[in-house]
Each structure stands twice: as C-alpha cells, then as structure tokens.
C-alpha cells in the first residue's frame, strides 16, 4: 500500500492530509483528519472512522482528551473495548512525517455493556517502540 501524507497548518489547527492506494482492494483513498500534538513533537490522529480500511481493517476509533505533564501522557477517558486491536497513527517529526502505527494494550474490568475502565495500559509504537504511559501507571 502506497501512502502520501503531509501535516498542514490551517490557522491554529493542524491536519493530516493523506492519499494512498490499496493494492489488495484496488482502490484509492484520501482523507483529512485533525492532528493532536504530542509532547514528543509528534501527532496523534483521532476519530479515524473515515479511513478505518487503511489501518489494517480496524474500525475502532475512540475519542479522547490528551493532557501532558513533564513528557508523560495522561488519558482521562473511558474507552469502548472491541474484539479488534485498537490502532492509531502517530506521526513523528524525526526525519520528516513518518507514519507510525500504535497498538493499545489494555487491562481492566469489563462491564456487561462492553465498556471497561482501563486501569493498566500503554501505547507502544510498532515501528520505533516509543511508549506513551498514562500518569500513575
């Protein structure tokens, strides 16, 4: 799959514009999403419903608030767990905007509704191994 992406500054907001071609599905795609700045200079993309097919068929896309202190990342949301892995894009500025795929490992008490308060969990980059730990973990 070929992907072309760029970070675009639009006023105070930052967006990711991505164009690509999925050889397996023989379809091209294009999307623009809000890019959440991260303490390490990268960006986290939220609400990826429109481009779920471009991230290994995973349609899981939670919305959350991101707060940081001294380089740590503090997540203050309850995420909806799904049977599929939770995947995110992380854009690192080192050497240009490279797409990093993040997987979420979570441990918590499942409720009947499928929700869980994630007590111990972390984000790790599958390419460079960067870990984003919630404060107090």
Curated annotation (Swiss-Prot):
The organism of origin for this protein: Ascaris suum
UniProt name for this protein: Putative FERT-1 protein
């Amino acid at each position: 799959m070929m992907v072309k992406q760029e970070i675009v500054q639009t006023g105070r907001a930052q967006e990711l514009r991505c164009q690509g071609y999925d050889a397996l599905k023989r379809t091209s795609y294009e999307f623009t999403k809000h890019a959440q700045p991260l303490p390490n200079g990268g960006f986290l993309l939220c609400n990826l419903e429109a481009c779920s097919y471009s991230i290994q068929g995973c349609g899981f896309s939670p919305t959350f608030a991101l707060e940081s202190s001294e380089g740590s990342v503090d997540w203050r949301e309850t995420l909806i767990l799904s049977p599929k892995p939770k995947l995110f894009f992380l854009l690192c500025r080192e050497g240009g905007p490279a797409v990093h795929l993040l997987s979420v490992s979570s441990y918590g008490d499942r409720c009947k509704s499928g929700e869980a308060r994630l007590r111990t969990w972390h984000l790790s980059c599958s390419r460079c191994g960067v870990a984003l730990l919630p404060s107090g973990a």
